[in-house]
């Protein structure tokens, strides 16, 4: 019998009706209640997900200000304990906790590695006891330098289960970038990999490990994960331990291990701002706030169910990420609700010599992924590469696509939808498969006329939201470990738009007067606190850096730094960073619209625009483009680019100059570095505007530095 896959948000609304007597005719009404009665809404989330605490909380929220709100004071939780709740029922259902592949194993055709729920629990207990034996106590920091492998999840859960504070950097980061982060938090333990595989290359990181050990005097212990030579790993760090040995215990003490009950606001992890200028800001989130917001987001809005629950039986969740991006944390959160997590470690685009954007799709086909998420740039690259998803294996289990990281263009979304229509048709032709309206292959995302769950009938008919695939486009941030805007399987799905503001998120577009506007582009603000907002920045006395980062423009109101339009129907469009805005002759626009126009051209692989504004002078706006191999930016190509902008946007946004470049500078998380390049071209020195170690491609900066010098000398540009 297939799972019905009723929308998770529908089940929650039915529960509200049956247990609270609350009935909402529209999502807008539900959202309005969630942001005006914070205590009632977040208490309902606590109760709906049956979050456990040995002690009661005496208030849902006290001092509801930003910063400074206190949530569920008196309650005790533990992220790892919430994960362990699913060990027995998921194991009884025969479902794994984690399925994983790397580049080599996928290419060789090997089966995925499988980590069962009981084995996950045993390894976590073993490592936790080892950390405790090394002197790790609640509040101590444990730093990790690990790739996206199951061992990283184990290390995280072991750390937080005993009250340690986790902090993670990806092993593609260099020594300086890692030390810029870890030195600020003085970790006592380092768990690290001595090698990483990316783009077909096995990269030795043993030198970096030695440099990290030397550069972190606070360290008392090192644990090394070695993919190739576990026996030799201990030779790397004197007094260190092998990861396999630290997770090998299987005795009465590991069987009896129980995660600590911790205060709701006990520090969980430390994540970092992008670090484009100065030292990265170490952002501290708490156990309880992260846990409760992750459940609400992942389940209600991403529609990712528990893998052993009848409504979502067999759910398999994948969101591609490196460990340097907060979406690794989002992938990890699948375990909170008993969802099987499918993870891939490596380059989703193949190798430099042999690009292959089918890699992740073949991975998803082999593992039977049901929810497939990635950065918006991944889908755009797939489209530009011209791949055919119907030739990537059986993808019919995928019922939802998730995107984030940057705005997803309407063109890319339409391409993906058309691809899945072909996937569906190809499946019918291959084996006569006819996709059901409801089930694991829930292509149409329909629940109209479906039998209601126990407790009452459905409140109203649910319309189809996206044939033949549902897109869950979200926008949030590392800053608060969550999302402000995202999906709802019951709402209309319009290409290029996100469906709604999320429950509990009092998000608005504010104009220059600080007033909310509809149908206009404004500053994205959040006027009410969220449980997952930062507890503080590590070492930030008096919250000086925290306040200047989010609350300097509007005291007491979170300014996120994005341009947002809320449409009359309640959907949302993100137009890019508000600090990288184009303002041409009084007409303001986010950069994403221009990128959509330019990058829709098959000749263009990537692009970046900056608007250089001056007092008393017209702005100067150069456009930088990466063209396909063999193409040259001649007069005809410039005319093509300008015409695309003129047609799609307005003649006002035609750039003053266009320049062909080899690469667009990007952060480690893949975001275009518009603001640093803008500052560089306005005359600031490169060392003041960008941290090269926080970049994915720092070598490309040399061209922009030379360009800025030529521009300053009057040789190019205005």
Describe the function of each predicted region:
Residues 29-33, 80, 98-157, 174-179, ...:
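Conserved AMP-binding/adenylate-forming core of the ANL superfamily
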Residues 221, 608-613, 622-624, 642-718:
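Conserved C-terminal "lid"/linker of ANL adenylate-forming enzymes
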Residues 289-316, 324-370, 385-386:
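Conserved AMP-binding/adenylation subdomain of ANL enzymes
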Residues 144, 169-194, 365, 372, ...:
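AMP-binding/adenylate-forming catalytic core of the ANL superfamily
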Residues 189-208, 344-348, 367-415, 427-438, ...:
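Adenylate-forming
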Residues 300, 399-401, 408, 413-427, ...:
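Conserved AMP-binding/adenylate-forming
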Residues 161-245, 368, 375-376:
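Structural core segment of the AMP-binding/adenylate-forming
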